[in-house]
Amino acid sequence: MTNGYIGSYTKKNGKGIYRFELNENQSRIDLLETGFELEASTYLVRNNEVLYGINKEGEQCGVASLKIDDNGELHLLNKCLSSKAGTGCYVSISEDKRYLFEAVYGDGIIRMYELNTHTGEIIRLIQELAHDFPTGTHERQDHPHAHYINQTPDGKYVAVTDLGADRIVTYKFDDNGFEFYKESLFKDSDGTRHIEFHDNGKFAYVVHELSNTVSVAEYNDGKFEELERHLTIPESFDGDTKLAAVRLSHDQQFLYVSNRGHDSIAIFKVLDNGQHLELVTITESGGQFPRDFNIASSDDLLVCAHEQGDSVVTVFERNKETGKITLCDNTRVASEGVCVIF
């Protein structure tokens, strides 16, 4: 049995963090329950037996740490709610487990926290830094919107996507916080959202929410150079849709991207050691607004959370040879679910 967790909004019926048990032998979720009620826990990241989630209480915003016990159940370690500048949308951990990074969409802010490497507890907020870059012309680009922050494969920097400014910004970081290093610009109104790095560290797949495209970019010392780009929806589709999540299969052979509105998952074959993509197919996600999904470590199953409608959680069997996914006759509900991790 594989334990997984789903983060959610708590604006309506969402509970914060859900826990589920994935039965990989039967290709189904045997259990999905409230794991821990945590307000606005819209993104999660795991470090072995510690789970970190975005959190807010009243006007205070920040992150929480939770201990995962032997049964997969969650127990609060501590919280660090040191800001009033908005709730985050993405969290990640540095390779050495000393720092937690957070991106805040609303006000275009990034935060950096110090962690206790022994207990996993959050010690303090080191820095909160606001982006101040020229923005695009799309109506949603009224000001910067940091949407993703994660350490680069070379370990030297963090890369931050800014949906409002159509760019990736890299920063050096240490115990004193962030230091600007380089920026890489994409097309106006792209709405740069997330990055998935190939394991070889040379190539990155940059997804753009507003243009519904994925860029293959060459990564070198904090800089991203676009090599090619692909639509993630059919060219004939003219409805309202926006790109959401991106994941590589663990064998690095296929890339998956979810589309909210078109309600689908686009599947690409990874070619030439990561530097090219080729569309395989676009598959219905089985619900409304597929905000996030993840692939089990076996590479056999894909689990997708849907933010809207009935907030179903769908399970797909995955063909390792073709990359194609097949919807299983097994759905659960995680209200306002927006993040899936194992």
From Swiss-Prot:
One GO MF term attached to the UniProt entry: 6-phosphogluconolactonase activity
The record's annotation in SUPFAM superfamilies points to: C-terminal (heme d1) domain of cytochrome cd1-nitrite reductase
Q: Which residues form a coiled coil?
A: none
Cross-referenced InterPro entries:
Cycloisomerase_2, Haem_d1_sf, Lactonase_7-beta_prop, WD40/YVTN_repeat-like_dom_sf
Q: Name one GO cellular component term.
A: cytosol
In which family does this protein belong, per the annotation? Answer: Belongs to the cycloisomerase 2 family.
Listed name of the protein: Uncharacterized protein SAB1858c
**Lineage start:** Bacteria, Bacillati, Bacillota, Bacilli, Bacillales
